Amino acid sequence: DKLDHMGIDVGVVSGIVSIIDYKVTAKGMSNHAGTTMMANRKDALVGMAKLIVAAEERARELSDTLVFTVGKIAVSPGQENVIPGQAVATFEMRHMEISRHSQKKFRTVNLNL
């Protein structure tokens, strides 16, 4: 993709990206969607959505060459009339040089759910 944008036809591979996967769980409290007022909800999916946005912003801050993706989310109990009590997502991070230090920086997301 980068070579196309730069108008270069041929490139030489200088490295292979490292891939780190995280399984992330957000826990809330399941309850009936019709009778639980907004102020009393602890929606795990809303918490996961906030965490995904914060992690994406953090990835952008850390490096122009780090990529971050969430490709899968499972919500429990998974009913449209029930507030989700749990959301589990797979976070994937790719970079040429993923050190323990950069992993620690990525994991540090200050979020008050």
Question: Where are the predicted features?
Answer:
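Short, conserved charged micro-motifs
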Residues: I98-K105
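Midchain, well-structured core segments that form catalytic/ion-binding scaffolds
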Residues: D1-I98
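Short, well-ordered amphipathic alpha-helical segments that serve as non-catalytic structural scaffolds
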Residues: L51-A54, F106-N112
